[in-house]
């Protein structure tokens, strides 16, 4: 993958750049991602978020290696609850999901749909498959983890150490709780 990857929402008004290699490329099968994915893809003009088995593809990057180059004022956040520790950020202009951010997290889980198929990083693992009604439908092309693995957490820790234990803030104008 290129060291600088230009990404954009469907209409091009919000543009981001991801620099360097991703921390990991995962498909999340957790209940929250499936619920949020269904909500996001039901919005007007929104692209499909969920895969055929309810999974959401994320390309995880360090926050300090993702820049919002245009359209910052168009960012909107969706939270599944007012007390939720995560938010999904989308481009308000066209309802393209951009990233999932955890409160206090040092990384962004960028939605895989932002990459053209031809250059999208390959999936390395599926997480939280225990939340699926029937995990046996998943292909066995990558590890299907019941939760998350030590390797997954080790990658996150390595990135956080490299960042000097910082967790940059990303301001988003609109915040919606559902």
Regions found by a protein language model. Give the residues of each.
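A short Gly-Trp-Pro
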Residues: 1-8, 14-178
């Amino acid at each position: 993958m290129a060291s600088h990857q230009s990404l954009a929402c469907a209409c091009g008004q919000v543009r981001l750049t991801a620099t360097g290699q991703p921390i990991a490329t995962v498909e999340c099968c957790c209940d929250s991602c499936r619920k949020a994915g269904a909500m996001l893809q039901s919005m007007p003009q929104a692209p499909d978020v969920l895969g055929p088995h309810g999974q959401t593809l994320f390309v995880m990057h360090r926050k300090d290696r993702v820049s919002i180059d245009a359209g910052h004022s168009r960012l909107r956040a969706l939270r599944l609850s007012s007390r939720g520790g995560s938010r999904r950020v989308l481009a308000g202009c066209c309802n393209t999901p951009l990233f999932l951010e955890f409160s206090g997290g040092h990384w962004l889980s960028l939605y895989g749909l932002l990459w053209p198929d031809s250059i999208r990083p390959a999936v390395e693992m599926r997480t939280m498959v225990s939340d699926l009604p029937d995990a046996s439908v998943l292909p066995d092309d990558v590890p299907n983890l019941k939760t998350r693995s030590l390797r997954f957490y080790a990658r996150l820790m390595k990135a956080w150490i490299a960042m000097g234990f910082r967790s940059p803030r990303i301001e988003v104008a609109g915040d919606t709780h559902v």
